[in-house]
């Protein structure tokens, strides 16, 4: 009897150290294999949510056009220096009428003197509201900005950011300066109708996503996509409509971004402000170029702002037919530029 008990005890001995280490190693390998798959699945879900959010914006823009027979414009005047954005104009069509009621459209979104503009106190209530449908869940940056008003110095007022930018020009020639009519659907005081989109709604971009700024200023080593370089005078600025103004080369664009004297992390810091820095984007280059965006002086509307995202390989975009597509970083540059124009008569057969 005792002998059988000893045999049973011998048969029930625990794991040896070697066996335990093998099991741990196997579990570690399984986790290592599964974790990237889980991360990819989560990013795919976030990218889908991003596309759905952008689709809501597109539907709102089209509903605005359907009701008013004109696409929403970007309000601006020389005295205001900053009008209301497309994103502000479509609030009633985004089921955000309660936020829209907080905006006093008889007053500008900003007040102060040129070069020293601040959020108009009358608009502070609306500007502090977060609109989830204007954000990409993959971005990961804090959308609440308390550091900035307009010129880079803040006084604690809360602004809420925006990832989805209105396409304000192809960026070719002088078509990056939205203070004047550009070749896109949106620019300052635009009144574009469907009849003016001769390229076709399925060949014309309305929105592209971009990354939020990182809330920080610096004079060197900028974070690409998160900080915008201040480059002073940009090629073609102030010459809108003049013939013969050529587009800057990619090398020049790189020099604008990498050779700036200072950088600000306020890209997309407010969905309310109708300025390229905050709510506009160009199609001059494919998504996610490897150098920083660049802007002119703080009192100007122009700059080279590109589509960017935290998604792998590209960025989401919204066409004027209401469809949302993912545009790869490797898309042909001329095709992407053509998608930014409403009446350029270009061949964009390569977007599929």
Features from the language model and the residues they span:
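Internal low-complexity, small-residue/proline-rich segments
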Residues: 40-352
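N-terminal leader/signal peptides at the extreme start of proteins
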Residues: 1-17
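N-terminal single-pass transmembrane signal-anchor helix
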Residues: 12-46, 56
């Amino acid at each position: 009897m005792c002998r059988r008990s000893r045999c049973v005890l011998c048969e029930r001995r625990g794991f040896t150290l070697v066996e335990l280490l093998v099991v741990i190693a196997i579990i570690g390998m399984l986790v290592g294999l599964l974790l990237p798959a889980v991360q990819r699945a989560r990013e795919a879900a976030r990218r889908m949510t991003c596309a759905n959010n952008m689709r809501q914006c597109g539907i709102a823009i089209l509903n605005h056009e359907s009701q008013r027979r004109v696409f929403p414009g970007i309000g601006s005047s020389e005295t205001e220096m900053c009008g209301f954005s497309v994103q502000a104009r479509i609030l009633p069509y985004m089921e955000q009428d309660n936020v829209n009621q907080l905006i006093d459209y008889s007053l500008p979104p900003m007040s102060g003197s040129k070069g020293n503009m601040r959020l108009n106190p009358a608009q502070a209530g609306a500007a502090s509201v977060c609109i989830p449908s204007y954000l990409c869940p993959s971005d990961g940056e804090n959308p609440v900005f308390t550091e900035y008003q307009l010129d880079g110095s803040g006084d604690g007022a809360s602004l809420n950011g925006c990832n989805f930018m209105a396409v304000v020009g192809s960026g070719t020639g002088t078509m990056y300066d939205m203070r004047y009519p550009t070749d896109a659907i949106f620019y300052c005081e635009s009144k574009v109708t469907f009849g003016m989109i001769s390229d076709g709604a399925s060949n014309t971009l309305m929105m592209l996503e971009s990354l939020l700024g990182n809330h920080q200023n610096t004079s060197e080593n900028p974070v690409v996509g998160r900080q915008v370089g201040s480059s002073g005078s940009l090629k073609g600025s102030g010459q809108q409509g003049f013939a013969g103004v050529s587009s800057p080369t990619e090398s020049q664009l790189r020099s604008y971004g990498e050779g700036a004297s200072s950088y600000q992390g306020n890209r997309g810091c407010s969905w309310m402000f109708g300025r390229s820095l905050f709510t506009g984007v160009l199609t001059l280059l494919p998504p996610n170029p490897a150098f920083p965006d660049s802007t002119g002086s703080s009192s100007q509307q122009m700059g080279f702002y590109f589509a960017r995202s935290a998604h792998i390989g590209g960025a989401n975009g919204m066409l004027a037919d209401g469809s949302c597509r993912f545009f790869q970083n490797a898309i042909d540059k001329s095709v992407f530029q053509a998608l930014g124009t409403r009446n350029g008569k270009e061949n964009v057969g390569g977007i599929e």
